[in-house]
């Protein structure tokens, strides 16, 4: 019995020694920092996944330039604001509410001459007499009238049906 008591007494002492060693290992500053880093990495990965769900990079690159620039990327993927604007395709159409006719300057004949280059050679490229100038202007006006008539006929044909096409 004395042997069993001594064995029992030795066991608690050995467990106390093990317990004392474990807290010493847990309290080392290196381990504490690594645990905090791991927990912060877990949180940051969760935040990144939630941001990716709500703000996918493919859909909103122009709305989030600061986020795109601040992320850690290889140098070829990281775009500065200058490069973002240079890489964009220029707008082919004017912004909403602004028609092309408001953007263009000049008289009707000048615009027509710009649109259809064959008129430039007919009217502006030659020295015309007054009669020839009048005749060329009459031809242009006749073309304009025919165009308007065709537009009106098309408009009436579209609206003369009981149901839309």
From Swiss-Prot:
Keywords: Nucleus, Transcription, Transcription regulation. This is Transcription elongation factor A protein-like 1. Residues 33-60 have a biased composition (Acidic residues). May be involved in transcriptional regulation. Modulates various viral and cellular promoters in a promoter context-dependent manner. Does not bind DNA directly. InterPro entries: TF_A-like/BEX. It is found in: Nucleus. Belongs to the TFS-II family. TFA subfamily. The keyword Protein biosynthesis does not apply. The keyword Nucleotide-binding does not apply. GO terms for cellular component: nucleoplasm. Residues 1-101 are annotated as: Disordered. The gene is Tceal1.
